[in-house]
């Protein structure tokens, strides 16, 4: 990948960057990508599409192109949408950030904490100490984790206590016990799935209907849904999921369950499908603080570090010790970070004025989707791949190169 990016060093950075993407497609390092950038003033409206939406050829032996309106799996990029929906409920007085979720999520409140296993291998469960709040859910400090990330939960599943996620019912995602008390540590987990349930119970609407009425309608979005199988217009032109073989680096079609069946309910942490252009509308609305989704003061709240110093330090230690996960995507691993309401906040500039600035908010999704909103620079960017696993080095390097090029162009005016 380095030879693609470093071949010519002194030309126009955007031209070089686009050349890198084209070469990556031509050499079959990626099937395709969509990259987008917008600014507050409307002077920058950048979109480029590269390559194909699948590695499978169609009946004409062609690879259909990946386009700005191609329906794609957002995976964890869904979490930003669910955060927005939960904050809308807060604005409307339906929930409070710091009240216990007991009223709306008694099933979560009753969930025990898995402490470990005794000498006979039996699970040791105890009552939770403290109450979970919406703020805990939005900042991943509730004590919940994902099975695939936590050794205690993996053992718990291996003993037959949990259904496989292949069942694709939300209760199989929400069934694992907590692994710590609320506020005890930052742990990445199924918090936004529970936040989605909170929105449903607070409003009386399922999350799909709420999404359509409160995010899609205000922004004029028609290709964003939890229910892909109910949208034949989107199914006909959706992207495939592609997987890179770890042994030889080759790309292969991934017959993922997520594309074959809708969830029994809506997964607020991972369940939405959307065209890249529609997702950019959400990012741009937040950047402009235009009031279409959230009041400006609520948007400002999203960008405020939400962790106390102890949790912030623990989160940084965890992230620095997890380069294989690399929650921050193209962000340098040594960067100081916090967590806001919706994503990771940079506590320092990434590279002076040449890249993301202090206070920028970022997150992404498993198919190597990376979004970021940078209020100080007045920019938002979106890199959209449909290639797993997450933290793919080719996608990561291309995303970093894209962002650097956009910042360089924008600084030049």
UniProtKB/Swiss-Prot annotation:
A GO molecular-function descriptor: acyltransferase activity
EC number: 2.3.1.238
Biological process (GO), any one: defense response to fungus
Consequence the record notes for mutating residue 334 to F: Strongly increases simvastatin synthase activity upon overexpression in E.coli
Result of altering residue 40 to A: Improves protein solubility upon overexpression in E.coli. Strongly improves protein solubility. Strongly increases simvastatin synthase activity upon overexpression in E.coli
Effect of residue 9 to V: Strongly increases simvastatin synthase activity upon overexpression in E.coli and abolishes activity with LovD-bound alpha-methylbutanoate
Result for mutant: residue 391 to S: Strongly increases simvastatin synthase activity upon overexpression in E.coli and abolishes activity with LovD-bound alpha-methylbutanoate
Note: Directed evolution toward higher catalytic activity with free diketides led to an enzyme with 1000-fold higher activity in simvastatin synthesis, due to numerous mutations that affect protein folding and promote optimal alignment of the residues that are important for substrate binding and catalysis.
UniProt similarity note: Belongs to the class-A beta-lactamase family.
Function description: Monacolin J acid methylbutanoyltransferase; part of the gene cluster that mediates the biosynthesis of lovastatin (also known as mevinolin, mevacor or monacolin K), a hypolipidemic inhibitor of (3S)-hydroxymethylglutaryl-coenzyme A (HMG-CoA) reductase (HMGR). The first step in the biosynthesis of lovastatin is the production of dihydromonacolin L acid by the lovastatin nonaketide synthase lovB and the trans-acting enoyl reductase lovC via condensation of one acetyl-CoA unit and 8 malonyl-CoA units. Dihydromonacolin L acid is released from lovB by the thioesterase lovG.
The protein's name in its UniProt record: Monacolin J acid methylbutanoyltransferase
Lineage: Eukaryota, Fungi, Dikarya, Ascomycota, Pezizomycotina
